[in-house]
UniProtKB/Swiss-Prot annotation:
Pfam families: Ras. One of its GO terms (molecular function) is GTP binding. It comes from Danio rerio. This is Ras-related and estrogen-regulated growth inhibitor-like protein. Keywords: GTP-binding, Hydrolase, Nucleotide-binding. It is an enzyme of class 3 (hydrolase). Transmembrane segments: none annotated. InterPro entries: P-loop_NTPase, Ras-related_GTPase, Small_GTPase. GTP binds at residues 10-17, 57-63, 122-125. It catalyses: GTP + H2O = GDP + phosphate + H(+). Its EC number is 3.6.5.2. Belongs to the small GTPase superfamily. Ras family.
Length: 205
C-alpha cells in the first residue's frame, strides 16, 4: 500500500485546516486554531489502488516549528498552496511559496513538476470582498505550472473533495519517480527565505 504525503501551505487565516477538515469529515469549521502540529491521516481508494494519505499543516505548529518548513517541502509528494481571495497579502505569500517549491524541485521531471502543486483560491463565498481576481490566480498557476482551483471550503464540499482526490492521484503517480532519486538538501539561504516569508505567522485557520 502506497503512502502519499501532501503538505497544505499558506498564510494564517486562509482556511487550510477548514479545507482539510471539510475533505475528511464533510463538516465546515469556521474558526480553527491549534498550538500543536497537525497531521491528518486517511485511507483512500484511487483508481482501484489503496493509499494511505497523510495531510500535513505545518502552519499549525508553534512559532519555533517554522524552521522545519524546508524539510516539509522535501518530505511531501504534493502541495496544496492556499490563499484567501479577499486578502491580497495571502496571495503574495502563496506566490512566494510556489516559487520556493519550484526552486527546491529544479531537478524534478516536467511531468512530476506539473502535477505536484495545486494553487487554491479559498473563500469564494466572500467574492463581494475580493482583492484577488480569478484571472490573477490562473495566471500565476499557468506561469508556475500548477493546477488551479478557486472554491469555498464553506460552501463547496464536492469541489474540495475533487481537488484533494486529484492531487492524491497525481502525487501517487509521481511518488515512484521520487523514490528513485535523492532530493538535494535545501540551502541555508533558501531556509532563511522561507523563515522570512513565514516569520510573522502564529496560528492557522
Amino acid at each position: 500500500m502506497n503512502d502519499i504525503k501532501v503538505a497544505v501551505l499558506g498564510s494564517e487565516g486562509v482556511g487550510k485546516s477548514a479545507l482539510i477538515v471539510r475533505f475528511l469529515t464533510r463538516r465546515f469549521i469556521g474558526e480553527y486554531a491549534s498550538s500543536s502540529e497537525c497531521i491528518y491521516r486517511k485511507r483512500m481508494s484511487i483508481d482501484a489502488r489503496q493509499l494511505n494519505l497523510e495531510l500535513h499543516d505545518p502552519c499549525s505548529q508553534p512559532c519555533d516549528g517554522k524552521s522545519t518548513l524546508n524539510e516539509q517541502i522535501h518530505w511531501a509528494d504534493g502541495f496544496v498552496v492556499v490563499y484567501d481571495i479577499s486578502d491580497r497579502s495571502s496571495f503574495l505569500t502563496a506566490k512566494a511559496i510556489v516559487h520556493l517549491i519550484r526552486e527546491l524541485h529544479l531537478g524534478a521531471t516536467k511531468r512530476d513538476s506539473d502535477s505536484v502543486i495545486f494553487l487554491v483560491g479559498n473563500k469564494q463565498d466572500l467574492c463581494h470582498m475580493r482583492e484577488v481576481d480569478r484571472e490573477e490566480g490562473q495566471k500565476l498557476a499557468s506561469e508556475s505550472r500548477c493546477q488551479f482551483y478557486e472554491l469555498s471550503a464553506a460552501e463547496h464540499y464536492q469541489e474540495v473533495l475533487l481537488m484533494f482526490s486529484k492531487i492524491v492521484r497525481n502525487a501517487s503517480l509521481g511518488s515512484k519517480a521520487k523514490e528513485r532519486r535523492r532530493r538535494p538538501s535545501g540551502s541555508k539561504s533558501m531556509a532563511k527565505l522561507i523563515n522570512n516569508v513565514f516569520g510573522k505567522r502564529r496560528k492557522s485557520v
